[in-house]
């Protein structure tokens, strides 16, 4: 049975428990066995992590032993997928730059706080994740992130909506959802869902998340079928 590991915790304001339960249900419906943990100790064994098809992060504003991040990095490098949303992934561990390097971005602001009305614009391309999806409105936090230029952007939103010091710059399209690779592993991120009910109010947000998680998990099968190794990525030089 293909397995998914979800670890949830951190700041309760992002409702990690209901969000992780939602993601677990979506992946079970897709045919995966799901394990949900409320402790980071599930990340202690890198070889066990590498057996999963997908790791889902749902942990905001936390601290983590760097060894655990290295374990996730090891597993993803071997082909395990990594996915998450909102602050549960890209504001999970502010002090760990390897985590930010692996995930592709870091939250820095949500101008205006919660309850901001904005549009999510789907960027159609080669990714199956966005096929058939249309632009959709969201009322939630409007996430401004610092992002890795290597990401493949799947959806964007226009800034500024709320005036602040950043609005003296030209209008920009901020990535909302993206994919990238980490070694042989696939990484998916979606900045939506300050609260769990965002996925109910904007069903396309949930569909985007479901497709992204499945896409990331399917990378494990590809790595196994093609006997991919990590030799070309390994380096003992100082990285951080």
Where are these regions (language model features)?
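Extracellular ligand-binding/catalytic regions of CAZymes and related secreted enzymes
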Residues: 2-3, 29-30, 168-174, 182-240
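Helical hinge/lid and interdomain linker segments adjacent to catalytic or ligand-binding clefts
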Residues: 3-6, 12-92
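Hydrophobic residues at beta-strand termini and immediately following loops
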Residues: 7, 37, 156, 190
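Short, solvent-exposed loop/turn segments at secondary-structure junctions
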Residues: 11-12, 62, 89-91, 158-161, ...
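Catalytic beta-strand/loop cores that center a nucleophilic Ser/Cys/Thr
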Residues: 28, 51, 108, 113-184, ...
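A glycine-rich, often tryptophan-bearing local segment used as a flexible ligand/cofactor-contacting loop or short
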Residues: 63-132
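Proline-centered loop/turn at the N-terminus of a beta-strand
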Residues: 81-83, 152, 186
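Oxidoreductase and adenylate-handling cofactor-binding alpha/beta cores
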Residues: 99-107, 136-152, 192-193, 206-220
